[in-house]
Swiss-Prot record:
Compartments, record wording: Cytoplasm
Lineage: Bacteria, Pseudomonadati, Pseudomonadota, Betaproteobacteria, Burkholderiales
Presence of keyword NAD: no
Protein name listed in UniProt: Nucleoside diphosphate kinase
Cofactor: Mg(2+)
Length: 141
């Protein structure tokens, strides 16, 4: 499997629960390296731009409101099959349907406050990484 990079966001609900370190441990335990990270409090404009693909969906306003409700932790993960590996670690979008031991099963409260975001494909990952790390201050190690 190829070395890939993927974008991960620890959402406001998980940041508020003080579980960033526990989530990072899961990434690293699965063989993923954190090659860039920063904490941010997204502006409405940034959240709307980042989630623009969902603009026509009925949940868009609530998603944006949630994502600007508190700080988020944004990171780039790197490793073999990083995109799929991260999605497996996250679990199903709805934490009630997520397998036991996944990030969402353990830390998420609802389908809206679901603890984490992860890129769903290589093309999406490239766009999402460039959105949050435009200077490409991402370092392989």
């Amino acid at each position: 499997m190829a070395i890939e990079r993927t974008l991960s966001i620890i959402k406001p609900d998980a940041v508020a629960k003080n579980v960033i370190g526990q989530i990072y441990s899961r990434f690293e335990g699965a063989g993923l390296k954190i090659v860039a990270s920063r904490m941010a409090h997204l502006s409405r404009a940034d959240a709307e731009k980042f989630y623009a693909v969902h603009a026509a969906r009925p949940f868009f306003k609530d998603l944006v409101d949630f994502m600007i409700s508190g700080p988020v932790m944004i990171q780039v993960l790197e490793g073999e099959g990083a995109i799929l590996k991260n999605r497996d670690l996250m679990g199903a979008t709805d934490p009630k349907k997520a397998e036991k031991g996944t990030i969402r099963a353990d830390f998420a409260d609802s389908i809206d406050a679901n603890a984490v975001h992860g890129s769903d494909a290589a093309e999406t990952a490239a766009v999402e990484i460039a959105f949050f790390f435009p200077e490409m201050n991402v370092y392989s190690r």
